[in-house]
């Protein structure tokens, strides 16, 4: 029994293991190109079953703890491997040995406490390696990257435990496009550790304290293009002139990101600019200045310029003692060579007039997302301020008057490009004054409702997108580019207003359609963006849009942003794919064809009616409907005649001379109704027939060949059908005046043939000796 339990337990474990492997394999999703995605799947190991067809494998953000020698041995064509954000603490020596095609390897944010050069010894073509966020203190006992001669991007270090950089660490690396070192707690930096790298395009350095900053800078200053310093507290930074005074520097750009300064340390940084003479661009991003702007030490140091810095960018500058900040007069003299300044989202409400006047080389000024108003702009753009300024960006400030803003900028004689978007102007005056060289104006998102002659006639580029405009009727003879998206325009602007327009972006309006003629009227138009409108996909519009191959070269957003809004059956379809029916696109032709068909049908119906007596049937139907409305039987007091006689005019002699004599002159006499004698003059014949039949006790039909051919006899017989035969009574008396071939009776007299087959009729005898008996039988039938 214990043996059986043991066997069952073993099989259960094997079954669970198999299911686990199967579940892990199924957790990968791979496309036909060999890209497999397994990130965020709670995997605790690398899935089995990987093949040579896998070229990209993403296993990031899982719970993998170990990478074994055989886990990836089949992935010989793998180029990208992402293992970041796992729990990996062990990587076996030959784990990546078979990945000779690997170009991208991410092992960041795991739990690796030791790094081994054997991992990378066969990765000759590796270009990207990320080892950030692990637990190692150093980069290993031997040179870790000596085999990675093609490496271009390297990220190493962590924010806590990485404390040492040694001279051998980067041996073998000669050129890197990007090197990121996270060493917030760096304690040891061996001189010349980075000097072995002959060229570094971009170095990102995370340092908490600046103690070793100059030592690092000395090693890289001659091989680095772009230095980015992050998360550093420069309160204690002190620049030593002797450190780099004799170095041939190549650094061109310097970025401080999330760095803290004091007044004193800022002075030291400015001194650095003067000695690292290659720096032409400096950026401060999300930095904090713990001071009050007391830079008098710069004057004592006789610092006259910011080195060769021409571009200065400041974003999200935090000044805790903002209301104690001084007037910056001590740095005015340093700004003479600066050509481009960006101060964004830093609560700037004023640029002092003296500072503006000292910015004699300034060509570009961006003061976006600040607190500038017309009152402070008046002081900033004072006389002789920014004499060479060409571009001014005042986006998202507190400007409210377009007219006043234009007047205040008249002092800027060389201004050509003005961005005052995202200010609340609301309206536009009829006239304005602007600098005489204005060519570009950005008024997007300013909530204006209409455009007036306030706009300068010299404009070549105008952006009025994201407003409330419903029309564009301005003449701008030099305008080349118009950006008017996200408004309420219903049609394209008139081309005669914009004779040299080459670019127009008019998407997200309420335009229903445009035509070939409209586009052709813009003779120099090269780019049109008109997607996102509510297009009515008419036949003409679809024919134009789908039939012009050259149109695709003009429409920048074709075909993905062009959708039909109507008709309803094509709503939601792309204009390129919409199809209308023949009747919708050729309405005139279809209507003409239908009319012709109806005419032919009517003509055919008329012919058939004539040949098949259709008109007669319609008349009878109408008479029948009229007769149906009358009472089924007339009251006895309304009976005026003993019999109504239906006969052909050609048989009138027999009726009027023989029948009348034998019936009306008999004693007692019978009263007959004859149409020639008793019909009421002026009354419709059909009404006379109906009334006479209704007021007669019997109806006598004098049947003959003439009767069958008589039109009125047909009417009388039909009405007798409706009133007499349909009621199944004996009010009808048939007299066969002469023999009739039943086959000769027309089809419309079907009831006559039926009656002659089912009812007894009186036949007029040609023998005079039998005629007396005929009259006796007729009188008896009328009297019954």
Swiss-Prot record:
Biological process according to GO: cellular response to diacyl bacterial lipopeptide; cellular response to triacyl bacterial lipopeptide; inflammatory response; innate immune response; toll-like receptor signaling pathway
Residue windows of the LRR repeats: 54-77, 78-101, 102-125, 126-150, 151-175, 176-199, 200-223, 224-250, 251-278, 279-308, 309-337, 338-361, 362-388, 389-414, 415-437, 438-457, 458-478, 479-500, 501-524
Residue ranges that the UniProt entry lists as topological domain Cytoplasmic: 609-784
Residues annotated as site: Interaction with bacterial lipopeptide: 349
GO cellular component: Golgi apparatus; membrane raft; phagocytic vesicle membrane; plasma membrane; receptor complex
Domain LRRCT: 525-579
Locations listed in the record: Membrane; Cytoplasmic vesicle, Phagosome membrane; Membrane raft
Signal peptide annotation: 1-20
Membrane topology designation: Single-pass type I membrane protein
UniProt family annotation: Belongs to the Toll-like receptor family.
Quaternary structure and interacting proteins, as annotated: Interacts with LY96, TLR1 and TLR6 (via extracellular domain). TLR2 seems to exist in heterodimers with either TLR1 or TLR6 before stimulation by the ligand. The heterodimers form bigger oligomers in response to their corresponding ligands as well as further heterotypic associations with other receptors such as CD14 and/or CD36. Binds MYD88 (via TIR domain). Interacts with TICAM1. Interacts with CNPY3. Interacts with ATG16L1. Interacts with PPP1R11. Interacts with TICAM2. Interacts with TIRAP.
Record remark: domains: Ester-bound lipid substrates are bound through a crevice formed between the LRR 11 and LRR 12. The ATG16L1-binding motif mediates interaction with ATG16L1.
Name recorded for this polypeptide: Toll-like receptor 2
GN (gene name): TLR2
């Amino acid at each position: 029994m214990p043996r059986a339990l043991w066997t069952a337990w073993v099989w259960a474990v094997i079954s669970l293991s198999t299911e686990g492997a199967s579940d892990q394999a199924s957790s990968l999703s791979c496309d036909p190109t060999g890209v497999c995605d397994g990130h965020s799947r709670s995997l605790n190991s690398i899935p089995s079953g990987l093949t040579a067809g896998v070229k990209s494998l993403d296993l990031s953000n899982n719970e993998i703890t170990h990478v074994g020698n055989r886990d990836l041995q089949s992935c010989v064509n793998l180029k990208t491997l992402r293992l970041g954000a796992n729990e990996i603490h062990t990587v076996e020596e030959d784990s990546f040995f078979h990945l000779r095609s690997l170009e991208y390897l991410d092992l960041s944010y795991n739990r690796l406490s030791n790094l081994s050069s054997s991992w990378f010894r066969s990765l000759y073509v590796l270009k990207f390696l990320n080892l950030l966020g692990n637990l190692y203190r150093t980069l290993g006992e031997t040179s870790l990257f000596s085999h990675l001669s093609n490496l271009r991007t390297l990220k190493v270090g962590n924010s806590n435990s990485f404390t040492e950089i040694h001279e051998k660490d980067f041996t073998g690396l000669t050129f890197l496009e990007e090197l990121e070192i996270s060493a917030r707690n760096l304690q040891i930096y061996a001189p010349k550790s980075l000097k072995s790298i002959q060229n570094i395009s971009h170095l990102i350095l995370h340092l908490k304290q600046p103690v070793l900053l100059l030592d690092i800078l000395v090693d890289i200053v001659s091989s680095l293009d772009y230095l980015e310093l992050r998360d550093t507290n420069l309160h204690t930074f002190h620049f030593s002139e002797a450190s780099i005074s004799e170095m041939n520097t190549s650094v061109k750009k310097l970025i401080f990101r999330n760095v803290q300064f004091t007044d004193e340390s800022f002075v030291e940084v400015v001194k650095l600019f003067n000695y690292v003479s290659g720096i032409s661009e400096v950026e401060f991003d999300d930095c904090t200045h713990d001071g009050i702007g007391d830079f008098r030490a710069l004057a004592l140091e006789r610092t006259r310029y910011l080195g060769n810095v021409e571009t200065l960018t400041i974003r999200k500058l935090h000044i805790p003692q903002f209301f104690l900040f001084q007037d910056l007069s001590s740095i005015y003299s340093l700004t003479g060579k600066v050509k481009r300044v960006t101060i964004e989202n830093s609560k700037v409400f004023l640029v002092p007039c003296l500072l503006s006047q000292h910015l004699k080389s300034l060509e570009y000024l961006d003061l976006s997302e600040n607190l500038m108003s017309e009152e402070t702009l008046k002081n900033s753009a004072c006389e002789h301020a920014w004499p060479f300024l060409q571009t001014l960006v005042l986006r998202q400030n507190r400007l409210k008057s377009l007219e006043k803003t234009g007047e205040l900028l008249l002092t800027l004689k060389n201004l050509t490009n003005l961005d005052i978007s995202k200010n609340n102007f609301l309206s536009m005056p009829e006239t304005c004054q602007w600098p005489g060289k204005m060519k570009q104006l950005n008024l997007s998102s300013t909530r204006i409702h209409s455009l007036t002659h306030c706009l300068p006639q010299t404009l070549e580029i105008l952006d009025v997108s994201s407003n409330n405009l419903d029309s564009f009727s301005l003449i701008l003879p030099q305008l080349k580019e118009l950006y008017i998206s996200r408004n309420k325009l219903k049609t394209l602007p008139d081309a005669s207003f914009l004779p040299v327009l080459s670019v127009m972006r008019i998407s997200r309006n309420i335009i229903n359609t445009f035509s070939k003629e409209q586009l052709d009227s813009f003779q120099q138009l090269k780019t049109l963006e008109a997607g996102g409108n509510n297009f009515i996909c008419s036949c003409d519009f679809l024919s134009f849009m789908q039939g012009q191959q050259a149109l695709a070269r003009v429409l920048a957003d074709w075909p993905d942003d062009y959708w039909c809004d109507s008709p309803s059956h094509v709503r939601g379809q792309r204009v390129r794919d919409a199809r209308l029916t023949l009747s919708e696109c050729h309405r005139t032709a279809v209507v003409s064809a239908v009319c012709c068909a109806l005419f032919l049908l009517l003509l055919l119906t008329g012919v058939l009616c004539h040949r098949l007596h259709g008109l007669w049937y319609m008349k009878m139907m109408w008479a029948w409907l009229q007769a149906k409305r009358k009472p089924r039987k007339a009251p006895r007091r309304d009976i005026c005649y003993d019999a109504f006689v239906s006969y052909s005019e050609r048989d009138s002699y027999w009726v009027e001379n023989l029948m009348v004599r034998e019936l009306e002159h008999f004693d007692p006499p019978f009263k007959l109704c004859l149409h020639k004698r008793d019909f009421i003059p002026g009354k419709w014949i059909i009404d006379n027939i109906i009334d006479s039949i209704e007021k007669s006790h019997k109806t006598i039909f004098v049947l003959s060949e003439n009767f069958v051919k008589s039109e009125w006899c047909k009417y009388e017989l039909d009405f007798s059908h409706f009133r007499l035969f349909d009621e199944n009574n004996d009010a009808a008396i048939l007299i066969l005046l002469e023999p009739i071939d039943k086959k000769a009776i027309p089809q419309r007299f079907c009831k006559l043939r039926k009656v002659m087959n089912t009812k007894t009729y009186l036949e007029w005898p040609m023998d005079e000796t039998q005629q007396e008996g005929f009259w006796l039988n007729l009188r008896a039938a009328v009297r019954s």
